């Protein structure tokens, strides 16, 4: 028995495609496929790996679930939240998390533009809304927009995925458009 685990951020449906390809090539093989995306931040990868705030595992069989549960047993014992779901949901969670954070950054930058035009202090606005436990203060720092190796590509990938299934994500698309507009016209 082999369990193939995808750790990378991959388009929704990749796990199923990997499984189908493997079954076609080796119909007699005993295996499962799992999606287990990493949530490592740039500059904090080692800490995030050792002390993740959550683990997301997409599986489609009890056998795969048990293997992954045993693999993550040390984190389970430390009460790290572990979310077991199907592969497509696991793949989507990774994109949704990164896109949400990118959209939050875009939001505070839009508020910064408004503050500049009406004479308000964006840092006080960010502090005031960030104290709301439902919102939180992280990613409420006005600046050049989101970047890095993940947020831009994951945002556009999620927009394209939604378009392919006729479920447009207008807020996310506008967030990406805003980022591009500010790159070319600061």
Task: Report the location of each language-model feature.
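A short glycine/serine-rich beta->alpha loop
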Residues: 141-145
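ADP-ribose/adenylate-binding Rossmann-like module
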Residues: 1-11
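Short beta-strand to alpha-helix junction loop
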Residues: 10-15, 97
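Single conserved hydrophobic/aromatic residue that forms the stacking wall/gate
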Residues: 178-186
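Internal alpha-helical scaffold of NAD(P)-dependent oxidoreductase catalytic cores
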Residues: 18-37, 41-137, 161-165
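Helix-enriched interaction subdomains in cytosolic or periplasmic regions
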Residues: 148, 152-176
């Amino acid at each position: 028995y082999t369990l193939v685990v995808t750790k990378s951020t991959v388009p929704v449906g990749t796990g199923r495609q990997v499984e189908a390809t493997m079954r076609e090539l080796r119909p007699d093989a005993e295996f499962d496929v799992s999606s287990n995306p990493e949530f490592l931040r740039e500059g904090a990868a080692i800490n995030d790996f050792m002390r993740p705030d959550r683990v997301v595992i997409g599986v489609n069989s009890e056998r795969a679930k048990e293997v992954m549960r045993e693999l993550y047993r040390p984190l389970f014992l430390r009460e790290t939240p572990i979310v077991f779901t199907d592969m497509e949901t696991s793949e989507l969670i990774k994109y949704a998390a990164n896109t949400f954070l990118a959209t939050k950054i875009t939001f505070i930058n839009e508020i910064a533009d408004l503050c500049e035009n009406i004479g308000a202090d964006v840092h006080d606005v960010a502090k005031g809304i960030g104290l709301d436990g439902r919102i939180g203060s992280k990613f409420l720092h006005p600046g050049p927009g989101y970047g890095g190796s993940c947020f831009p590509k994951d945002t556009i990938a999620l927009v394209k995925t939604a378009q392919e299934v006729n479920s447009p994500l207008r807020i996310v698309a506008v967030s990406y458009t805003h980022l591009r507009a500010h790159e070319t016209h600061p």
